[in-house]
């Protein structure tokens, strides 16, 4: 990764074999700690073929995928079916609101969420609580409706809003204009989930 002016390079490039080799070298320690490997991002499914190749070369390591689910169906299935657990981030129930805040609609995300229910891979749905955006009654009611309509019971975890972006923008000398009050405290109402018999908790 380079800086905005190309003046600084951060990170390293690996082949799938090189990355798997590094992870396998720590396998014993990870197993002793009852840990494993979590592929997160950004969005790890942007490199789905590489990710699938890497997972195939891991030796007896628990693999978790942290994804927003916005990927082609075949890419999502190829990776999720290789994992032991999936953290599925679901931000907004309404298609237009999703497009407004993320730049894309949620059609592929909802399709892959339903697909995940059929793969047999254990997973949890996580909703980041962005004040005034994702913590609204309308959005939480919509998400509860989506989850209650899935072909299997899935727990939901409401995550606290991460305010780290403000500092990162400042470090990059960029103006932070989130379009919402990022200093406000979210106020999620769990009753939207309990009313539909959906298990939900505050992280």
Task: Give residue ranges: language-model regions.
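Hydrophobic faces of well-ordered beta-strands that scaffold small-molecule active sites
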Residues: 37-39, 63-65, 86-88, 123-125, ...
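Conserved radical SAM core fold
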Residues: 44-46, 69-76, 86-102, 129-130, ...
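Surface-exposed amphipathic alpha-helices with a cationic face
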Residues: 51-60, 117, 148, 194
């Amino acid at each position: 990764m380079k800086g905005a002016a190309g003046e600084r390079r951060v990170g390293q490039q690996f082949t799938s074999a090189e990355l798997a080799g590094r992870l396998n070298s720590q396998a014993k320690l990870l197993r002793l700690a009852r840990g494993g490997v979590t592929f997160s991002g950004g969005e790890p499914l942007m490199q789905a073929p590489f990710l699938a190749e890497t997972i195939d070369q891991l030796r007896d390591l628990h693999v978790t995928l942290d994804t927003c689910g916005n990927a082609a169906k075949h890419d999502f299935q190829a990776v999720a079916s290789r994992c032991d657990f999936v953290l599925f981030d679901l931000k907004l129930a309404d298609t237009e609101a999703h497009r407004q805040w993320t730049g894309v609609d949620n059609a592929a995300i909802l399709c892959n969420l339903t697909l995940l229910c059929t793969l047999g891979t254990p997973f949890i749905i996580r909703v980041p609580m962005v004040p005034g955006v994702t913590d609204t009654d309308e959005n939480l009611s919509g998400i509860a409706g989506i989850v209650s309509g899935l072909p299997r019971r899935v727990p939901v975890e409401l995550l606290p809003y991460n305010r780290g972006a403000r500092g990162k923008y400042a470090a990059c000398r960029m103006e932070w204009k989130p379009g919402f009050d990022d200093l406000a405290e979210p106020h999620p109402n769990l009753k939207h989930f309990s009313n539909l018999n959906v298990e939900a908790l505050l992280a």
